[in-house]
Amino acid sequence: MSSRRRKPEWLRTRPPSGRRFTEIKETLRDRDLNTVCEEANCPNLGDCWSGRDGPGTATFMLLGDRCSRGCNFCDVATGGMDPLDPDEPANVAEAVAEIGLDYVVLTSVDRDDLDDGGAGHFAETIREIKRRDTSVLVEALIPDFQGDTDAVDRIIDADPDVVAHNVETVERLQWPVRDRRAGYEQSLDVLRQIAAADGCYAKTSLMLGVGEYAHEVYRTLGDLSEVGVDIVTFGQYLQPSRSHLEVFEYVTPDTFDVWKRVAETEFGFLYCASGPMVRSSFKAGELFVEALERDGLDIEAARAAAERQ
């Protein structure tokens, strides 16, 4: 099924606008910072940046704006890697403070060209944010670091509140969806390592609509639960351009609702954000705090609970 046909009504969004959106964009430009919201053309950009009742969520993309890998679903540019910007950790922390974020998501391109995959730079950014304000919640959405457990530990040791790594799709479809250097078992190993650590929650995300079968999604939820993942999200894959992987199907909102119920009630995930427009970082702060409140936890209690896991 071609993704070039007319999108269903539930996938139509309005372009981002408003004072809050403009303020955040200007702050990012002033500090020459990248966000995955913009680089990957996320459809929720305006919604997340504006927030519903607070300052919202922004996802900063570290280590440059070009990736060393070429996943067939992703709109981030590949190749031509630049040196790391030594001022980026401080600039990100300053932007977080200026915008007034109380929940920030940090992600990065893959940097297989660097000895540590960029883990040290990533970790330093987390520490810079926490140095300025220990109350800011930090979610680190990390690459697989080519299976380097020491690199993953460097992220964990920087004390983020949530560490995410996206498995992206079911095992059968890892290729052609992801770059051949990625792999299902390698991603499960990263998530297992995160889940075994003290003081943070483990999170992952899957795209639907790339040709997966329901029993494969169910099995993937089982695998994720088995390695200790706390949070999972589901969203519709949308083709960034005609040169990218085609959409196999547009999954209905009702189907996304079913997967949310299965994930939370049958597999016991802390929460599952599931919907056609959901992305890994979609309203991450709002949903995380709501999930903690449902469990009767405040932020400090949640951190203590994570340390006891």
UniProtKB/Swiss-Prot annotation:
Pfam families: LIAS_N, Radical_SAM
PROSITE patterns, alphabetized: RADICAL_SAM (PS51918)
SMART domains membership: Elp3 (SM00729)
InterPro entries recorded: Aldolase_TIM, Elp3/MiaA/NifB-like_rSAM, LIAS_N, Lipoyl_synth, rSAM
GO MF annotation terms: 4 iron, 4 sulfur cluster binding; lipoate synthase activity; metal ion binding
Annotated metabolic or biological route of this protein: Protein modification; protein lipoylation via endogenous pathway; protein N(6)-(lipoyl)lysine from octanoyl-[acyl-carrier-protein]: step 2/2
Co-factor remark: Binds 2 [4Fe-4S] clusters per subunit. One cluster is coordinated with 3 cysteines and an exchangeable S-adenosyl-L-methionine.
Catalytic activity: [[Fe-S] cluster scaffold protein carrying a second [4Fe-4S](2+) cluster] + N(6)-octanoyl-L-lysyl-[protein] + 2 oxidized [2Fe-2S]-[ferredoxin] + 2 S-adenosyl-L-methionine + 4 H(+) = [[Fe-S] cluster scaffold protein] + N(6)-[(R)-dihydrolipoyl]-L-lysyl-[protein] + 4 Fe(3+) + 2 hydrogen sulfide + 2 5'-deoxyadenosine + 2 L-methionine + 2 reduced [2Fe-2S]-[ferredoxin]
Alphabetically ordered keywords of this record: 4Fe-4S, Cytoplasm, Iron, Iron-sulfur, Metal-binding, S-adenosyl-L-methionine, Transferase
Subcellular location: Cytoplasm
CDD domains: Radical_SAM
EC number from the UniProt entry: 2.8.1.8
Keyword S-adenosyl-L-methionine: yes
Residue span, Radical SAM core domain: 53-270
Binding residues annotated for [4Fe-4S] cluster 2, in chain numbering: C67, C71, C74
GO cellular component: cytoplasm
Binding site for [4Fe-4S] cluster 1: C37, C42, C48, S281
4Fe-4S keyword on record: yes
Family recorded in the similarity comment: Belongs to the radical SAM superfamily. Lipoyl synthase family.
Name this polypeptide is given: Lipoyl synthase
UniProt source species: Natronomonas pharaonis (strain ATCC 35678 / DSM 2160 / CIP 103997 / JCM 8858 / NBRC 14720 / NCIMB 2260 / Gabara)
